[in-house]
């Protein structure tokens, strides 16, 4: 559960992330494909080389979902409900991949915006991304 301090930290960080989120999300996807090759299964039709337009386009989708989650921190589950349903029912993505992407997002954010990451902000970011992952797998039951 995100505290008010967590929400404030996430919103404060996102003011800096927002301008770079498409790049960060594409970078995180590339990192995930390299670190967790099995995650490429769902993107067999993609050219997975870095800076590829397909990765950037999917990164933009990830970015949009994260922006929506930040905009609705009091209702992340409701905000991501349709996306959760899509991944669970239609795409049938193994939920472990959300955790992989979460970790890669944290690394990418740190690589791009390390000057804005104090320990308390990192903890809040981690809790936020955990909440996003938890809510994305909510329709798997």
From Swiss-Prot:
Residues 1-141 form the Globin domain. GO terms for cellular component: blood microparticle; haptoglobin-hemoglobin complex; hemoglobin complex. Gene3D superfamilies: Globins. Pfam families: Globin (PF00042). InterPro entries: Globin (IPR000971), Globin-like_sf (IPR009050), Globin/Proto (IPR012292), Hemoglobin_a-typ (IPR002338), Hemoglobin_oxygen_transport (IPR050056), Hemoglobin_pi (IPR002339). GO terms for molecular function: haptoglobin binding; heme binding; iron ion binding; organic acid binding; oxygen binding; oxygen carrier activity; peroxidase activity. It comes from the Eukaryota. Heme b binds at residue 87. PROSITE patterns: GLOBIN (PS01033). SUPFAM superfamilies: Globin-like. This is Hemoglobin subunit alpha-2. The lineage of its organism: Eukaryota, Metazoa, Chordata, Craniata, Vertebrata.
